């Protein structure tokens, strides 16, 4: 659902938080790229986003699929194998001029990161994949 006024559009997060039962790590981003930039319907799927390229290098892994449902399933399987969960800090936000950079996103509703941690008690580390302040990422 979205609502637009002037240069701002209200957007709700399009994806569910993904946290495998065995998750030891939780990657927390800000909000997905604008839907016009999706290569697949999952986190960090923007055409210009380098998250999955970095993951490939860090883990010496190569993803076979880079678009569509197979890319989503491949990444979920990979995250499960590495005990990594993934979410974003904004549940609903204003987006300025359809831009995807953090400085063009303004929170309306923040994700309750503490609830995720309460539900998944094995998570030992939070990895912030954003330039936004830590207090915003944790909903403080």
Locations of regions flagged by a protein language model:
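Active-site and ligand/interface coordination hotspots across diverse enzymes
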Residues: 1-57, 61, 119-124
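Short, surface-exposed acidic-centric catalytic microdomains
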Residues: 36-103
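Glycine/proline-rich loop-helix segments at beta-alpha junctions forming the active-site rim
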Residues: 1-12, 17-20, 90-140
